[in-house]
Design a protein with these regions (language model features):
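Hydrophobic cores of alpha-helical transmembrane segments in multi-pass integral membrane proteins
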Residues: 3-26, 36-57, 69-91, 105-128, ...
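Interfacial helix-loop-helix junctions of multi-pass membrane proteins
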Residues: 127-135, 139
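Membrane-interface segments at the starts/ends of alpha-helical transmembrane spans
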Residues: 1, 65-66, 137-140
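Surface-exposed, proline-enriched loop/turn segments that connect beta strands in immunoglobulin-like
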Residues: 100-101
Length: 174
């Protein structure tokens, strides 16, 4: 799962962060909170994700140093991941009132919240003592589903709600 985790992480994290960084400011009609934070968090994710894969191979025949390295890099991923989450939520500073009536922003806030929860769970589950309890349980399955359905699906639905009316020359879905 070393390669698999990195492939999933890059396809389901980096690409959808791009969707968030494009559509969230468009819909909120505000600039992204911190361009510098977005650059820093993206490149830190790229650097750290490469070595995060071994956290799925704890308590296997993989050498201990590799398992420890994977665990360490996974825990370190919490910082850049939450940098992206905070950047997304802070972009809405001054536009939280729009959340009451705007379904696109609702989908995006739910997605960003799931991204935050998922990226908190992942590093915690990578810690050896937590992994000993959580491995081979439904917690791992729930973690994957919160990332895939909560983060990826919700940000995608929000983006589709933004794009579909514009494809047909309208400003809003209804």
């Amino acid at each position: 799962w070393w390669y698999g985790h990195n492939a999933v992480g890059f396809f389901l994290t980096a690409g959808f962060l791009g969707i968030m960084y494009y559509f969230l400011p468009k819909q909120a009609q505000l600039p992204i909170y911190s361009y510098r934070l977005s650059i820093l968090h993206f490149w830190t994710l790229v650097f750290l994700y490469i070595w995060a894969g071994p956290h799925h191979l704890l308590y296997t025949a993989l050498p201990d140093w590799t398992q420890t390295l994977g665990m360490t890099f996974s825990v370190m991923l919490l910082v850049p991941s939450w940098g992206g989450m905070v950047n997304g939520l802070m972009t809405l500073k001054g536009a939280w009132d729009k959340l009451r009536t705007d379904p696109i922003l609702k989908f995006m806030v739910v997605a960003i919240s799931f991204y935050g929860m998922s990226t908190f769970e992942g590093p915690m589950m990578a810690i050896r003592t937590v992994n000993a309890l959580s491995h081979y349980t439904d917690w791992g399955i729930g973690h994957v589903h919160s990332g895939a359905l909560g983060w990826v699906a919700m940000i995608s639905i929000g983006a589709l709600y933004y794009m579909i009316p514009r494809v047909f020359g309208k400003k809003e879905m209804y």
